[in-house]
Swiss-Prot record:
The modification Hydroxyproline is found at P61, P64. GO terms for biological process: cell-cell signaling involved in cell fate commitment. Residues 53-76 are annotated as: Disordered. Belongs to the CLV3/ESR signal peptide family. Residues 1-26 form the signal peptide. It comes from Arabidopsis thaliana (Mouse-ear cress). One of its GO terms (cellular component) is extracellular region. This is CLAVATA3/ESR (CLE)-related protein 46. Keywords: Developmental protein, Differentiation, Glycoprotein, Hydroxylation, Secreted, Signal. Disulfide bonds: none annotated. Glycans are attached at P64.
Length: 76
């Protein structure tokens, strides 16, 4: 039991000594908060896109190449 007490006291002393070196000074944070601004034309088009804006992509077939394999694997 005596060894256990010594180890705990050494760990507490080490934490106390290390806390003096590790602590940092906190700085104030300034937020840019001001009065609410009235926007004449809201820009809702970027926030919620319409379904008409979607672009349809052409999907290429995944079948074999009819003209042959231009770069066949190397045989060793």
């Amino acid at each position: 039991m005596r060894r256990h007490d010594i180890i705990i006291k050494l760990l507490l002393l080490m934490c106390l000594l290390l806390s003096r070196f590790v602590t940092r000074e906190c700085q104030e944070v300034h937020f840019k908060i001001g009065p609410a601004k009235i926007i004449a034309k809201p820009n809702n088009a970027r926030v919620m896109p319409t379904w008409g804006e979607e672009k349809k992509w052409h999907k290429h077939p995944s079948g074999p190449n009819p003209t042959g394999n231009r770069h066949p694997p190397v045989k060793h």
